[in-house]
């Protein structure tokens, strides 16, 4: 399966002063990151994804309202961290309160307070005043605030990159001693030392700034193990590995780039969708949408109609002519049947049965008449006209027989054969009648058979005539088209002959010019080679010199003297190279360094070392998914593309089988076609057969092939709609942000007011332990780790102060001092009362009047 990566154009050249060169980048990848070109290594930073994550963590307000909660939770985290540091210092100061109590309070001062509560408040305010004075002298609040900012910065780096990078100083392993200010008292020294431990750790460990991370840091991942190095500086990077606590998911595999990086794609999509929805709404307010169906153009329709009317009978004309011929044939057949009946009746009444010779002759004429009638019927197909009179005469010649039986009887002599009867006898007459009746029956049957044969022949001839007519029509159309094509070809041949004549002349002319140019180019190449060799020009500079020489005008007619021509050429060289002294090695090195900082050079190194930058859209594996995701891209420098390196090429060749992807335009029928703005399905595509028919139609008509005569008829159209962005994208993204906050900040459960309003979720003690415990372990030095009970007390104090509406009451610092010194204050009050009882001898001082006196 293919992988998708993001390579912003010239990512490494975004570094100051031109960035790192391609060769140095390759050496750095091999030396510090273990690149061999045989195992794929993933580039975590700098990539488009990591840069966007850092931008979101630094400026969450410009992304979306969901990201604003990030500032809220980080601010609350800092407040709890600084409060815990104060509580930790006060816990350390508790043993010092004994000296503080004896030196600060006098027994006789108790006499000035009428109530014990007043004395307690006085002692509390004294403690607060003394601690605040020490804090002011040491600058504790400002120093702890800076430490809190560094703590929040470390958390931000972890959320964006998965860990917190640092650059240790040269004296990292050198022991450093604390030198307090001699004017500090014991309390101030404790506070100063507490801050100094964190400050020393930050100074020696060197937490990287945002600018250094963006411009001077490279992070790779190889089989779940991350490698970190600087790009431009020589110092190696030692990561401040909060991973054991900060990254509670365990080993960082490539699928878990960073939790914030998984939100970046959805944020980009939401921003794009909101802008597109706004643009679509504004467009709908100012534009009318009309659905049309484009049909055959008027010019094409008129041309086709005129051609078919003038040269070719339409289908309607053919049907009408065939109908007329059929009616005419029916009338003719009916007329022939009537005349045949009349002729048969006349023959039976007028014929003489005794005129045998005449009867035989008439039979012969009858056969001849039938043959002649068949010939006339055949001619009827061509002339489509049959003369009724001629047909009647032919029929009368057959049936009007005049038989003279008396003459036949008179001429009969001799003996009669056996079985014969004498003509004129009773038996002869009866036999003659029977014979006549048989002949009449046979004659009728013969005529009916001949009539059926003639009718069938007539129908067959009609069909043949129609087929021949259609064939002749097609031949006429083809002939006319061929005649037009021949005329057009003749004209084209004539034009081609004329063009060939001109081309031959041009070729001869160009051939002479080319020969001259070849000679000039040979001389120029020799001159350029000599100049390049003497000036020590690089290959790129040689190309630029050749381009400059090609762009210069011919100096053959230039009247300037030789010295002025040399000055002009020198000026051109200065403009080209910036200095005439091109032999300087620094200039050559500078030009070569620029070539090593191009986008192509970086891409070649990454592909050769099989370093694959993380994609902007995590989880995109195929080109189709990438194309759909890239629709949401809002910046040109976000360039997702398919991985193309040696490892992927080898894996691709090892995969058996072949995946066939049908994209738009690859099939002959173009059933589905897509582009960036529209997708449609053609239910009646132009197939090869249809294209061949269209080509034949173009050849037979006067419509030229480039003219568009077929247009799509749109059946259904679905326009872009303004969808519910909040339902489709807003709510899922908000849920993802809630999961991110709950996972990384350990928030409390949702709290609702009595009226049902949801309150902002707050941090818990687990939130501070999650990040603060490991931070104290690495940065705190000799300071003890975080105590859960102390954290709970701090969280309760901070939460109680945040819930108080009256802002006139004391803040977190004063409340924290009184809370932490509650027991020492109570012990101080009791100690003063005990001392007063010993002096006065009164057991119940509070109920006596001595305080009032």
Curated annotation (Swiss-Prot):
Keywords: Coiled coil
Keyword Coiled coil tagged: yes
Coiled coil location: 313-343, 480-528
Domain of life according to the entry: Viruses
Name under which the protein is recorded: Uncharacterized protein ORF28
Organism per entry: Ostreid herpesvirus 1 (isolate France)
